[in-house]
């Protein structure tokens, strides 16, 4: 069918598999639909509506033509692109890009608006706000339950983003209440569906919203920042929307969650490295401990070649795969040059030590900083952030020469990506930790988020909206050049572009050390403090409670995409708590490795050695949980269809705990000393755990042929 030319009256089947079918009719009311074999209900979207040259134009299409595809991508997804001219504005063309696979019911699609060659028009905002409707969808077929799912509420108590769910009642539809999403799920008698968009922000800030109506419809519309007023559109300079997601499954919420989780793990991104369940070590907590507990007053004192090489050796004993050098390794931002005072032989010697152990290197970066004296700044002077006409002031980044904030929504993004590619090739860096990225701060008319024909406020909104799309472009450029590369976006503070968009390219660094004293209304003077600003920095159960909060996402989004670090410190009970926590997916270790006793190193090495034999199974398994985070007991079961996986039982009180697994299990590969495992007639495990004090019990299951 490649190149087939159709009138808009025909249905174009893009993917007619057992997983999903996507049809484009191109009509105003029936523009694009998603259906599922064996399910009567379908998701039908109306045509998008743009404001072009001051007039509202519905993008119903004439003469739809496939111009590309189906093209099979590396993640077993096929991409096709279809175009047609707008009936009501014939000099405009709309492209519809669809990604689908017979292996997942979740479909991604986006729109691209361009002009006919030799013509142009503008996207306008006659009412001084975004005038863009992405489509309306009838959800009347799913009346059992409708739920808004917010992924971006920042919880000050855990000092992390949290998942929350909000019912969308019939009264909400009657009163045309708007919901921010980014996901809405709807459940009927025999099927369930979801609608979602890929963007990012911290609630309640939103750039798009789902508007309900008494007719049982959802209209997804732009709120602000989706495009700058007077945005020129030509044949070469097309306007491209964000990606949207839709899915239908047989069953209910559990089946929908499992399908979406599998989509996020395998089919959402082409950058497969971000989904690998490596065990990470990061130097930052050791640097913090030295400043506050070592009384050095300096985050950088420990960071030198000798110390790093010693820590690499210990990390290898513990079972770490990726060793991340946090702030301290660079002499200046922008060019990201190694600090030769701390590392007189460069980082090549660290690279060689890591190679010897079969480990990988990671480094810290801030994409929004460039030293004034750097070559990067010289090449990208016009990309410096400005706000209200004032350039970013000069400031020092971790005691390095003066830097200025630089805008990623500008041509600079390519230069930054290419510099990281150079570093990756030189030092075998596969992991990039990105930190310090505020979503706000630039309204310059000289970048790629609006020009002088619109207002400062409009350009600032567009910067905030576009930031995550440009971050993803950087990640994708890096991963195209460095297969297996991983970019981790630190969202441990508020005001960052958290949502579904970045997950199409990378993963999140979810939690640092939890709340500050000030979050708990405890007076803390940042200027004169002599104690650590974080409350939960000690071994034991409490810090792990906070860091496990991100496991709430695991039902829908795999926990491997939310990196958290756990402490390997004695006593034994704390070691088990932290081991069990990181095995559930967050997969990080930090702290002062040189204070971990030999028996602790052996425990981590043995336990993580066993875990690595089943970690792919653990990552793929949908979670079963009994008890809330911090409860006693709090039980997590991660057993894959083949019976491999693990169970972790946390308890805060002395006494016995018994648990029967929901799934049949393979033989025991490794277990902690405080658990007895039996098997029932169905092959499920009966776990009898004994706790003398707060601790965790861990058991890992694996078939012999899996080892």
What is each of the regions a protein language model found here?
Residues 111, 236, 281, 354, ...:
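Conserved, mostly hydrophobic/aromatic
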Residues 176-177, 186-187, 580, 628-669, ...:
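Carbohydrate-binding surface patches
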């Amino acid at each position: 069918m490649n190149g087939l030319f159709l009138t808009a009256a025909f249905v174009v089947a893009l993917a007619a598999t057992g997983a999903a079918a996507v049809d484009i009719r191109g009509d105003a009311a029936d523009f694009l639909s998603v259906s599922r074999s064996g399910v009567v209900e379908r998701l039908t979207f109306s045509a998008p509506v743009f404001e072009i040259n001051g007039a509202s134009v519905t993008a119903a299409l004439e003469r739809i033509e496939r111009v590309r595809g189906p093209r099979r991508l590396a993640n077993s997804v096929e991409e096709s692109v279809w175009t047609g001219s707008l009936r009501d504005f014939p000099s405009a063309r709309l492209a519809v890009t669809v990604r689908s696979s017979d292996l997942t019911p979740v479909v991604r699609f986006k729109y691209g608006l361009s002009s006919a060659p030799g013509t142009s028009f503008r996207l306008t905002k006659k009412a001084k706000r975004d005038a863009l409707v992405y489509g309306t969808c009838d959800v009347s077929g799913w009346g059992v339950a409708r739920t808004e799912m917010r992924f971006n509420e920042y919880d000050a108590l855990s000092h992390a983003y949290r998942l929350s769910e909000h019912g969308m009642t019939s009264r909400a539809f009657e009163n045309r209440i708007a919901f921010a999403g980014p996901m809405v799920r709807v459940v009927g008698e025999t099927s369930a569906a979801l609608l979602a968009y890929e963007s990012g922000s911290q609630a309640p800030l939103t750039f798009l919203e789902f508007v309900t109506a008494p007719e049982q419809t959802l209209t997804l519309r732009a709120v602000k920042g989706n495009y700058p007023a007077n945005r020129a559109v030509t044949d070469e300079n097309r306007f491209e929307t964000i990606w949207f997601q839709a899915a239908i499954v047989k069953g209910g919420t559990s089946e929908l969650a499992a399908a979406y989780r599998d989509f996020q793990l395998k089919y959402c991104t082409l950058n497969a490295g971000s989904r690998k369940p490596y065990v990470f070590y990061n130097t930052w907590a050791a640097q913090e401990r030295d400043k506050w507990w070592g009384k050095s007053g300096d985050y950088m004192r420990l960071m030198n070649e000798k110390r790093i090489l010693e820590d690499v050796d210990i990390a290898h004993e513990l079972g770490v795969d990726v060793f991340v050098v946090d702030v301290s390794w660079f002499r200046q931002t922008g060019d990201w040059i190694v600090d030769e005072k701390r590392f007189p032989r460069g980082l090549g010697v660290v690279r060689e030590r890591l190679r010897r152990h079969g480990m990988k290197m990671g480094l810290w970066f801030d994409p929004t900083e460039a030293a004034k004296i750097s070559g990067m700044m010289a090449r990208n002077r016009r990309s410096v952030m400005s706000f209200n006409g004032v350039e970013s002031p000069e400031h020092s980044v971790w005691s390095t020469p003066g830097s200025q904030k630089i805008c990623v929504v500008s041509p600079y993004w390519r230069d930054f990506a290419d510099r990281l590619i150079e570093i990756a090739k030189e030092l075998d860096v596969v992991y990039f930790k990105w930190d310090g990225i505020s979503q706000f701060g630039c309204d310059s008319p000289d970048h790629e988020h609006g020009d002088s024909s619109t207002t400062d406020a409009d350009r600032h909104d567009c910067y905030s909206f576009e930031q995550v799309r440009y971050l993803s472009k950087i990640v994708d450029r890096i991963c195209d050049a460095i297969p297996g590369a991983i970019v981790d976006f630190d969202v441990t503070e508020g005001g960052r572009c958290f949502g579904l968009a970045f997950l199409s390219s990378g993963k999140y660094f979810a939690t640092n050390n939890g709340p500050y004293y000030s979050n708990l209304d405890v007076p803390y003077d940042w200027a004169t403090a002599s104690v650590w600003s974080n409350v939960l920095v000690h071994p034991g159960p409490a810090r792990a409670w906070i860091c496990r909060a991100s496991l709430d996402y695991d039902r829908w989004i795999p926990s491997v995409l939310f990196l958290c670090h756990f402490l390997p410190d004695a006593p034994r009970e704390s070691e088990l708590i932290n081991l069990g926590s990181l095995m559930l997916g967050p997969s990080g270790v930090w702290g002062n490795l040189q204070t971990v006793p030999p028996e602790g190193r052996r425990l981590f090495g043995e336990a993580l050695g066993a875990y690595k034999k089943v970690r792919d199974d653990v990552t793929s398994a949908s979670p079963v949980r009994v008890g809330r985070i911090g409860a006693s007991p709090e039980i997590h079961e991660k057993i894959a269809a083949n019976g491999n996986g693990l169970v972790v039982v946390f308890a805060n009180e002395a006494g016995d705990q018994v648990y029967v697994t929901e799934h049949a299990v393979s033989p025991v590969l490794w277990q902690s000393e405080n658990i007895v495992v039996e098997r029932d007639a169905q092959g499920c495990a009966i776990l009898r755990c004994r706790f003398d004090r707060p601790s965790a019990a861990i058991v890992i299951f694996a078939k012999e042929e899996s080892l």
